[in-house]
């Protein structure tokens, strides 16, 4: 890989964001001589992005920090189809109302990372439904479809692997890569965008856009993809044992978000500090030198910095303090997740097994049972080893709540109503 002249590509390289670039010399020269507008597309198939999207959001963050213009593309049009890249089956089709509602919720996250406005490097959020939903199908086939080879499209890994596993690929989904390529050209026409970024699974789709632009007479367009990250143990980023690590606070509490990053494996701490925080590299190198139990301090800094970017510094510090009190002082922190229960249920007693599942601490009764038998469940910091144990009114403490603990790191406050 080249030693880059431009600040943006230097940061991308130094921090580990780069998987592939379509033309390293050409892109570096472009970034060195002018303000570059670039974009990443986000799929609005849920009402929140999850932590797997943070890598791309940080790429946009650094793009703006180094004096360039990041564009957020919401797939309001392509979302009606769903990206088939490396999926074994078709996604559930959403309505336009579903997607519009999801986009409204997702937009809030980007304001934490990007500056929006009318200045040259200010960001904006664009919805590809603006042009895709008004296309004339016959004109599109004639003017755009003629530039795509089905033979070549079938050779892309995202399609080939699915067909080799004998999973069907609908004509609807097959059109996705054509629409994404068209997005790139349309965004150049409307906003002067010269580069698309994305995960490495999007390489084929982005290259399609570059080639379409060449055939339609645009200036040279560029691709930059990031690696598809997993943890050192092979787990997919953005997923936990309890499901997706959502970015919206109404879908995952800031405390749970902080805790996800606090539980980072030792081998991943330095890599994640580079990718997910704006900390200077010299500070990251100092933290990476920590060994043994000292690495836990680096994990706390990692969790707090990532949470601060998403939820604000004050709240990040508050949840870090909650964690400290919970784990080090065994007291109740203000930001622990809460689960509300009918107070009448406690008069007769509620089964501990059921409550562990309902409160989201355990995925199943059998998992809860194993933890109880192993001494891993506590009620108000007292170990409970009886799987038939009932939670009753007398368990309510002076603060009017009941603290449930599942293992060392998962806690919920039960609040009777």
Curated annotation (Swiss-Prot):
A motif ('KMSKS' region) lies at residues 236-240. Its main location: cytoplasm. L-tyrosine binds at residues 39, 176, 180. One of its GO terms (biological process) is tyrosyl-tRNA aminoacylation. Keywords: Aminoacyl-tRNA synthetase, ATP-binding, Cytoplasm, Ligase, Nucleotide-binding, Protein biosynthesis, RNA-binding. Catalyzes the attachment of tyrosine to tRNA(Tyr) in a two-step reaction: tyrosine is first activated by ATP to form Tyr-AMP and then transferred to the acceptor end of tRNA(Tyr). This is Tyrosine--tRNA ligase. It comes from Bartonella henselae (strain ATCC 49882 / DSM 28221 / CCUG 30454 / Houston 1) (Rochalimaea henselae). The lineage of its organism: Bacteria, Pseudomonadati, Pseudomonadota, Alphaproteobacteria, Hyphomicrobiales.
